[in-house]
Amino acid sequence: MKNNLLFDFTVDKAAKTVYITREFDADLSLVWDAFTKPEILDRWVAPKPYVAKTKFMDFKVGGRRFYAMVSPEGNESWLIQKYTSISPKTNFKLFNAFADKDANPQLPGSDWDYSFSEQNGRTKVNITIYNESLSRMEKMIEMGFTEGMSVTLKSLDDLLSTLSQK
């Protein structure tokens, strides 16, 4: 059933942009919730063996999500996101940056644009990530961003399969 699900990851260095397209075998409402509800996000958004821990999240325009990716040894890497646009079950945009433990952003950051569409019971998510700095984007990719996104989206796929059965 999960065979032939679309996954595309493209890096455009000239535009300082990463384009990700991923298809999920789940309805749009469930996929939207998986990207917008902290209790679901924390179950998949960190690449294993890391876990995500949301300290606070206010999913509204101008709202923020502050969370950590926690290593098995307990080391925390904090991130802050600010929601800049929300069109329910269609699109949302945010600014993302690493942060210190007090939610102070460490710039430069990146602008993320998520678009959702559903066809025949499958949901396609298009993610466009514009980086303020080419060197930041190159460093993220060097640190394993491509592999990390692939692993986390696979974790989401597995989680959606479990949640769909409920």
Range-by-range predicted roles:
Residues 4, 37-38, 62-66, 94-100:
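Short Pro/Gly-enriched beta-strand edge/turn motifs at strand-loop
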Residues 22, 54-57, 79-85, 110-117:
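Hydrophobic/aromatic beta-strand elements that line small-molecule binding cavities or substrate pockets
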Residues 28-29, 58-60, 84-91, 115-124:
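A short, structured loop/turn motif at beta-sheet edges
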Residues 31, 41, 65, 83, ...:
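Hydrophobic pocket/interface hotspot
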Residues 1-51:
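Hydrophobic ligand-binding cavity/cleft-lining segments
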Residues 1-3, 132-166:
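A conserved amphipathic terminal alpha-helix motif
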Residues 19, 39-76:
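Short beta-edge strand/loop motif at the mouth of beta-sheet-based domains
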Residues 15-17, 95, 101-147:
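Beta-strand/loop substructures that line and gate deep hydrophobic ligand-binding cavities in soluble
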